[in-house]
């Protein structure tokens, strides 16, 4: 069976063969299989050495101190630790938190949990259509009792980039902690934590050709950020995250981050051309809309709404392409994407969206093929749509009164 063209890199990426090779060296008796917390023999020392080297590799990509990297099981855990950890530790200083309506569920759900614990959350509305959360919005929402602002650097559905450097200046001036979810940003945009005033940052390995099940939380040392641990046990990771370290996964994450640093700029340039080619081609169709900011974005995403076409039907028609409607974390529900709804899209347009996301194995031939089959599928589905016929006849659908069955 021929495999479909993979255009869902925002959901996950395959492990780079070089990363897999490094990981394999840490699994069997011949390799570095020891427990990094075993301080009394060489097996433990060797594992610890690999873990600390990987910590340096991750820190180097984001220009941080290796001692500021805390290993977790992924960005979801990192987000939970950052939000609940800071909120619970500093609750006596204030109970107000700012986030936005278009964050990942790994931020929104902990916020709901904190609301139940008595915290007050302000959910910022993004700019219509572009999805930008601006420094001005944050400035207007900051209060003396705001202890934390949590915003993503790159949105996982539309690829819009938030100006976290400018927002960091505002939060630092207000003596407010700033957490950034950078799961979709690492390896795609430059991150310099030696200059950015960001206190906590979440990462995941599987978004940049590393393994699933491993991530990290950057926790600033100066000015110091303290957290209330959410997982208790052996006191690993300076007490912030207990649990035996998975050496092979950590080594994989370190290797993936190092490789990303070497290829990032050239790869963004290459992918930008592919994205533009697909978007330019899709605009041959009528009633096609770009979701997200036209320029302030990363090249890896193209989120498009095809009016008068149901996104689920379109996905089913694109058997040769692996794409998603909404994000993979919420695509189990048939609800329209809450991110696109927050951008002001109608239910119909939100339902008709497809997210194409590109990566290092995407070729120009892939784009040509996907463009051809997408155009054909949209045209075929519109032929079946009575709404499309009405639109073509010049009927304003917003004025139509639908009879109840």
UniProtKB/Swiss-Prot annotation:
Q: Which reactions is this enzyme annotated as catalysing?
A: (sulfur carrier)-H + L-cysteine = (sulfur carrier)-SH + L-alanine
Q: Where does it live in the cell?
A: Cytoplasm
Which domain of life does this protein belong to?
Bacteria
Chain positions with N6-(pyridoxal phosphate)lysine modification: 207
Active site residues of this protein? 329 (cysteine persulfide intermediate)
Set out the biological process GO terms recorded for this chain's protein.
Answer: [2Fe-2S] cluster assembly
- Gene Ontology cellular component terms for the protein in this record: L-cysteine desulfurase complex
GO terms, molecular function: 2 iron, 2 sulfur cluster binding; cysteine desulfurase activity; metal ion binding; pyridoxal phosphate binding
EC number(s) per UniProt? Answer: 2.8.1.7
Q: Pathway, per UniProt?
A: Cofactor biosynthesis; iron-sulfur cluster biosynthesis
Which InterPro entries does the protein's record reference? Answer: Aminotrans_V_dom, Aminotrans_V_PyrdxlP_BS, Cys_deSase_IscS, Cysteine_dSase, PyrdxlP-dep_Trfase, PyrdxlP-dep_Trfase_major, PyrdxlP-dep_Trfase_small
SUPFAM superfamilies assigned: PLP-dependent transferases (SSF53383)
Query: What keyword terms does UniProt attach to this protein?
Result: 2Fe-2S, Cytoplasm, Iron, Iron-sulfur, Metal-binding, Pyridoxal phosphate, Transferase
Instruction: Provide the binding site for pyridoxal 5'-phosphate.
Output: 75-76, 156, 184, 204-206, 244
Report what the protein is called: Cysteine desulfurase IscS
